Amino acid sequence: MSKKEIIAMILAGGQGSRLGILTRRTAKPAVPFGGKYRIIDFTLSNCSNSGIDTVGVLTQYKPLALNSHIGIGSPWDLDRTSGGVSVLPPYMKETGGNWYKGTANAIYQNRHFIENYDPEYVVILSGDHIYKMNYLEMLDFHKKKNADATIAVFEVPLNEASRFGIMNTDEDDRINEFEEKPKKPKNNLASMGIYIFNWRFLKRFLEEDARDESSNNDFGKNIIPNMLNKKRKLYAYRFNGYWKDVGTIQSLWEANMDLLDDNNSLNIYDPKWKIYSVNPTMPPQYIACNSDVKRSLVVEGCIVLGKVYNSVLFPGVYIGRDTIITNSVIMPNVIVGNNVIIKKSIIGSNARVDDNVIVGTNDNISVVGAGSKVKESIIQ
């Protein structure tokens, strides 16, 4: 294996239990997003656009759809003979195997994969966040600070800071304290779960953590606090762009709706920072003459005979006559019958909604699971 300056390790094994029935059959990073993507596409595209050509994707929970989506990495230009993308499930031994015990244990189990490339730096990423970031700019910051570790942070409203891991820093952005979901936060710099480490430095801490039977083997709970206790040089890298942890139904719906804002800061149309994905071979979308579509994303393969307002339609969606869709996310290959009303809902892939049915209200978000058949109204 050729030596690499930096490689990326993407944590993509999360169950995503807060997404409920949307992750009953698939891992959270493989959940559809934004009309034609899956959530992990943003992290993979960031790697590609940042010039990082060696990526390990650590999978675990129901990985079939995720593994199939990633394939050999062609959409992200990661189908390479040297480096490229590698899917890394938990290791099996002669005596059996276990799931990854925590985020740090996931990296520890795959330390030999990292060693193959003898990197100077490793960037640890989450596969379930929506954002665009140039990791090489973060690496430059890391080098200039002569840091042992650099953690990307995002300013959140102070009244919401208690929901996050908060980094307390000095005037030079050196981290002097980490508080996990503090009741009375001292500032609003939330960890984004994006880390750059000097590999040899991180390896020592991972080995020490693996020997500690009382450890949760987690970066936030164990590795970072241990580094701070030993007075190592950790810095906060402030990120000012769009960032969303889509780990809940509410945040997933909000992130999709954000794309419909004319001035949204994510801007998936930026030709200088494209978001790549596996694009299905489908015919162009068809919008019937008596239909009406406003402020919506409608992608290839869709047939719209009804009305669609402020909604996101994925490939292969069929909207029947006299049907009205508002403020909703309709995932791939959903068939919606005639005279249907869908409000503020997320409809999972391959679901079927029969004629004359009402789904959702303008209050709470209604969710229909993948492959479900809706024969009666759902008003909640």
UniProtKB/Swiss-Prot annotation:
What catalytic activity does the UniProt entry give for this protein? alpha-D-glucose 1-phosphate + ATP + H(+) = ADP-alpha-D-glucose + diphosphate
Pfam families to which the protein is assigned, alphabetical: Hexapep_GlmU, NTP_transferase
Q: Write down the top EC class of this protein.
A: transferase
What does the UniProt keyword field contain?
A: ATP-binding, Carbohydrate metabolism, Glycogen biosynthesis, Glycogen metabolism, Nucleotide-binding, Nucleotidyltransferase, Transferase
Q: Which amino acids does the record list as binding alpha-D-glucose 1-phosphate?
A: Y100, G165, E180, K181, S191
- EC numbers, comma separated: 2.7.7.27
HAMAP family named among the record's database cross-references: GlgC
Subunit and partners: Homotetramer.
Q: What is this protein called?
A: Glucose-1-phosphate adenylyltransferase
Organism (species): Clostridium acetobutylicum (strain ATCC 824 / DSM 792 / JCM 1419 / IAM 19013 / LMG 5710 / NBRC 13948 / NRRL B-527 / VKM B-1787 / 2291 / W)
Q: What is the lineage of its organism?
A: Bacteria, Bacillati, Bacillota, Clostridia, Eubacteriales
Encoded by which gene? glgC
